[in-house]
A protein has these predicted regions:
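N-terminal secretory signal peptides that target proteins for export/translocation
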Residues: 1-12
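Bacterial N-terminal signal peptides
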Residues: 11-26
Length: 352
C-alpha cells in the first residue's frame, strides 16, 4: 500500500497536486490508451512504470502466434480442464530441458473457475483438476501473456505454483499474501519539516521548487511483499497493480475506463496538511460454492475490492488513524471497485 500525501493546503489549482505528489512515485510517463504498461526496477532498486507506446500486435503476428500452438489449443474453450498430476508428470518428463510452453501457460486458462477432486479408487490414484475458460495466447509488446481473442491475461504455471506453495499442507492457512509501498518514518518527519518551511497558503517558491524539495525530503519509499517470494512473478503482479492503481488515483496514469479519480475529487482546503491517504486491494468474491459431496468447488464472481484508510502524520513521522473519513477517497475506491471488471478488461495487470 502506498501512502499518498495530500498536499491540497497550498494547491492553487488541481494540476498542482498531481505534480506535487508525482515526486513521491517517480513514474517515467503517464500511461495512455492503446499503450501497454508495466513496471521495471532500475539498478538502484527503484520501481518505475514502463510504457510501450505501440503495443498492438498486427493480425499477422497474432495469427502466427496462434498457429504455432498445438492443434487443440488454437481454439477458445468455455471450459478447459487441467489435471495437476498430469501437469506434474509433464514437467518431470522434461527433466532439465525446461517446461513446454503449453504447460507453462496452463493450456491457455484465463482464470480458475472450478476445482474438481477425484478420490483414489483401487489402484487408480486420486486427482485434482482445475478448470475454467481458455483461449490461445500471445505475448504483447510489454511482455505480458494474454488471450489472443479477448486480451485477458493467461494464467501462468509459475504463479499457480507460487500460490500453492504459499498455502501448502501443514502451513498456516491464515497467512497474509500482499504488498505494501510505504514512506519511511524519517522521510515523513523530514517532509513535515519541509512543508512548514514553505508555508501553507502562499508557499515560498514555485511548484517545481516545492516538488523538488518534497522529493528530497521524503526520500525513497519501501516496497514490502508478504506471503510469497519477493522475486517471483506473483509478487511483481501484486506490486504493479498496487502501484499503478495509486498512479490512477493521483492523476499520473489515465484510467482505462471513464471514472472519477481522487485527484479530481479532492477539494482545496478541505483536508489537513498532515493527512495521508492509503488505498489497497482485497479479494471480494461473491461466494465459494461447494458440492454436497465436497468434491467440486466453484469460485463465483471475479471480485477485487479497493479499500481506503485515512491517516495523519505526527511531527516525528508517526502515522495515526484519522478521525474523519475522506469523501473523495471513498468515491474513488467505490468507483474503482464497481468498474473493476471493465478496468481489468482494458489493463491486463488487474486481470492477473
Amino acid at each position: 500500500m502506498l501512502t499518498v500525501p495530500r498536499l491540497l493546503r497550498f494547491r492553487p489549482r488541481p494540476s498542482i497536486l498531481a505534480v506535487a505528489v508525482a515526486c513521491l512515485l517517480q513514474p517515467q510517463a503517464s500511461a495512455q490508451f492503446n499503450n501497454a504498461a508495466g513496471v521495471a526496477i532500475d539498478p538502484e532498486g527503484v520501481l518505475r512504470t514502463r510504457i510501450v507506446t505501440d503495443a498492438g500486435l498486427s493480425a499477422e503476428q497474432r495469427r502466427a502466434a496462434v498457429e504455432a500452438l498445438p492443434g487443440d489449443l488454437r481454439k477458445a474453450a468455455p471450459l478447459r480442464k487441467v489435471a495437476l498430476s498430469r501437469l506434474e508428470a509433464a514437467i518431470s518428463a522434461r527433466g532439465d530441458r525446461g517446461v513446454p510452453d503449453d504447460v507453462a501457460k496452463l493450456a491457455g486458462l484465463t482464470r480458475i473457475q472450478y476445482v474438481f477432486i477425484y478420490p483414489a479408487e483401487g489402484d487408480r490414484p486420486g486427482e485434482i483438476v482445475i478448470a475454467g475458460p481458455a483461449e490461445p495466447w500471445v505475448t504483447d509488446a510489454a511482455g505480458r501473456v494474454v488471450g489472443a481473442e479477448t486480451g485477458s491475461p493467461t494464467l501462468l504455471l509459475e504463479d499457480v505454483a507460487t500460490a500453492l506453495r504459499s498455502f501448502a499442507p501443514g502451513q498456516p492457512q491464515d497467512r497474509l499474501v500482499g504488498c505494501s509501498i510505504d514512506p519511511t518514518k524519517e522521510g515523513l518527519a523530514k517532509m513535515q519539516d519541509y512543508l512548514r518551511t514553505v508555508g501553507k497558503v502562499n508557499p515560498k517558491g514555485g511548484a517545481d521548487q516545492i516538488v523538488a524539495g518534497m522529493r528530497e525530503a521524503l526520500g525513497p519509499q519501501t516496497v514490502t511483499v508478504q506471503g510469497v517470494p519477493a522475486g517471483s512473478h506473483f509478487a511483481q503482479v501484486l506490486v504493479e497493480a498496487d502501484y499503478r492503481m495509486k498512479l490512477i488515483g493521483i492523476g499520473l496514469e489515465r484510467p482505462p475506463v471513464k471514472m472519477p479519480v481522487w485527484v479530481d475529487l479532492a477539494a482545496a482546503g478541505a483536508v489537513a496538511a498532515n493527512a495521508l491517504q492509503r488505498w489497497y486491494f482485497v479479494p471480494d468474491y461473491e461466494c465459494v460454492r461447494v458440492s454436497e459431496d465436497d468434491l467440486a468447488i466453484e469460485l463465483v464472481g471475479r471480485g477485487v475490492k479497493l479499500c481506503g484508510a485515512d491517516e495523519v502524520v505526527k511531527p516525528d513521522g508517526t502515522r495515526l488513524s484519522a478521525s474523519r473519513a475522506d469523501q473523495a477517497s471513498r468515491t474513488f475506491t467505490e468507483a474503482f471497485t464497481a468498474k473493476y471488471a471493465e478496468i481489468a478488461a482494458r489493463s491486463p495487470v488487474y486481470g492477473q
